Each structure stands twice: as C-alpha cells, then as structure tokens.
Amino acid sequence: MDIRILKDKNNALLNRRELDFIVKYEGSTPSRNDVRNKLAAMLNAPLELVVVQRLKTEYGMQEGKGYAKIYENADRMKDVELEYVLKRNVAPGMETEGEEA
C-alpha cells in the first residue's frame, strides 16, 4: 500500500491538520485502520489522534481517494468529531471497557 498526500492544510481554529490523499494498493481495499496506521507512521503522528473521515474507491481501480484529520490533542478531537466517526476509527477489539461492541 502506497499513500501520496495531495493536500496538507493546517487548521489552527480546530487544532488539526487536514489531509487529502490517494492510496494505491493491490488486492482488496485496505481497511480504514490500515490506512490510519500508515498515515500515522508516515507523518510521525500518534495513532489515536488520526481520524480517517473518508475513503472512496472506484470500481476496478486499485486506488482510492481519502480525507483524514490529525488532531493536536484528544480533548479537541472528542469535542469536534461526531461519535460515529470516532467509532469507525477504532480498531476492532480496542474499544474501551465501558463500551459495548
């Protein structure tokens, strides 16, 4: 899997970086969690502060376009992001103890 950043914008108002990217892959579409891990490693960002908002692929293409956000702190992320988006970005089996799967 190869990720190329198309646009990297700093949003000071919301304390986050906003990224437009293209992910190229072979085989099946990579999971949201795989893309999060790769982005965090590429940009030296803490994994828990990376949110993949969108990942779209076209039929028959081995690439997808995506939009991700990297927050400066977890409190700001929880204030801004919707709950279902945060749940999408948690790896299976990593939910907190108080939540049900």
From Swiss-Prot:
Has keyword Isomerase? no
Give the keywords, sorted: Ribonucleoprotein, Ribosomal protein
Key word Endoplasmic reticulum present: no
- List GO terms (cellular component aspect): ribonucleoprotein complex; ribosome
Tell me which InterPro entries the record gives: Nucleotide-bd_a/b_plait_sf (IPR012677), Ribosomal_eS24 (IPR001976), Ribosomal_uL23/eL15/eS24_sf (IPR012678)
Q: Name one GO biological process term.
A: translation
Tell me the Pfam families matching this sequence.
Ribosomal_S24e
Which GO molecular function entries does the Swiss-Prot or TrEMBL record give? structural constituent of ribosome
Family statement:
Belongs to the eukaryotic ribosomal protein eS24 family.
User: Can you name this protein?
Assistant: Small ribosomal subunit protein eS24
Q: Which organism is it from?
A: Methanosarcina barkeri (strain Fusaro / DSM 804)
Q: What is the lineage of its organism?
A: Archaea, Methanobacteriati, Methanobacteriota, Stenosarchaea group, Methanomicrobia
